[in-house]
Amino acid sequence: MKDLYQDLLRYYCFAIGKLPDEANFLKAMKETVTPEELRIFFMLPFTGNIAERKLLSRARRAGVGREEFFKRAGRLVEQGMIMRYSRPGGQTYERGNIVHMSEQQVRIKDDTPRRRVFARLMDAAIEGEIGLTPNRTPFYRVLPVEETLAGESRQIDMDKQVRDPRAVLPLDIASAMVRAEPLVAVADCYCRAARRIVGKDCGHPLETCLTFNELAETLLEAGLARRIDHAEAVQILQNCEREGLVHFVDNAEGRIRSLCNCCPCSCILLSVLKRDEGNAGGPSRYVIRYSGASIPELAQCVQICPMGALSYNGTLTVNHRRCIGCGLCVSRCRELGHGDALRLVPRGKHPRIHRSNEALWKQITRESAVGLIVNKLKGKK
C-alpha cells in the first residue's frame, strides 16, 4: 500500500532538500494529519489552484462523499496544509507552498511535537544548516522605506531643483500596495516565532507579518491571523521601520499575498542574503548613493544597515553588491539632520518582477525541478 507520509516527505524534500530530522518529521505529521486527509491533499494540483466543484468530482471518483470531503479539507486548512479561498466562480483550493505549510505549524499556539519539529526546521534554515530550493528567481523582493523614495532631481525653468517622481512606481511603495488590497490581516512573524520556540528570541516585535486576500482569508479561517484595516497595516509598516526591520514583498506585480518585516537576527530572507547563498529574497529597485560629504555622525547611519554594506572611516564606503536598497540608512541620516548625504537612486539592474504570484510560483517550481535534477546528476544532496 502506498505510504502517503513518505510522499509528503518527498514533497518537502523536493523544495528544501534533505530534512535534518526526517524521523521526527514523519512522526509529527502522523500526529497532525490522517492518511484519509492526505488523500485529499494529493488530489490538489502540484502548483496552481482547483475549483471546489472539480475537486469534489475527483473526491467522488475516489469514493469520498461530499460530507467527508469537507470534513477532511477543513482539517487540512486548519493545519495549514492547503489554502481555501473565494473566487468569483466559487470556492477554490490549492496546496500551501512549503513555506506556507511550515509557517502555519509554527503559528499554532499549542505546544505540540509537530510545532517544535517545524520550529527546529526553520531555525536550521535560518542558520544555514539545510539547503534551500535551487531556484534563481527570488520569492520576495525588498521594498524601501517609503519616505526615502523622492526620485532623482532634475532641472526645470527658473533654475529650481525638484524631485522627479518618474523613477518611483506603485510597486515600490509599501503603503500604496497595502491600500490596494481589499482584505488585510496580520499574523506572527514565522521566523521570529520559530526562534522564540527554540529559545533564540531576538526581542523584535512578533505580530508584523501582513497577509492579503486569499492568504489572509485562509489564515483567518484557521484562526492564525487577525483582520485589520488599511490604517493599522500602514501603522505596522511605520513601526517596523522605526525598529530597523526590512520590508519584503512577493516578487510579483498585481495582487500580493504577503509582506514580511524582517530583522537581520532572526529572519531567513536576510540571513540567506547575508550569507550570499540561495535566492529567497532579492534587492529593491534602488541602491544607495553617497554624496561624498565628510560628516563624522555618518557612522551612526552605518550601524543600522542589516547587510553590513556600509563602513565609515572619515569617509563612507558603500559595498553596492551587498546593498539591498532598503533605505534604512537614508532614513536614519535624515533623522540625524544630514539631509541627502545618503539617498536612494534607481538600481541599474534588478531581479525580474513577475507579472503575478501565479507566474512567479510556476517559474520557481520549474527552476527548482531543473536544479534538483542537475544537483542529483552532480551527486549533490
Language-model features, listed with the residues they occupy:
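Ferredoxin-like iron-sulfur electron-transfer modules
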Residues: E31, R61-V64, Y93-R95, V246-I256, ...
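A short, conserved structural fragment
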Residues: G74-P88, L310-S311, G339-L342
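Short, amphipathic alpha-helical interaction segments positioned at domain boundaries
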Residues: G90-I130, E367
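Long, low-complexity, charged/polar intrinsically disordered regions in eukaryotic proteins
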Residues: M1-K27, N251
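Catalytic cores of enzyme domains
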Residues: E129-V287
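Flanking helices and flexible, charged tails adjoining ferredoxin-like Fe-S electron-transfer domains
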Residues: H320-K381
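Short amphipathic alpha-helical interaction segments
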Residues: A62-E78
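Short acidic, hydrophobic short linear motifs in intrinsically disordered regions
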Residues: T47-R61
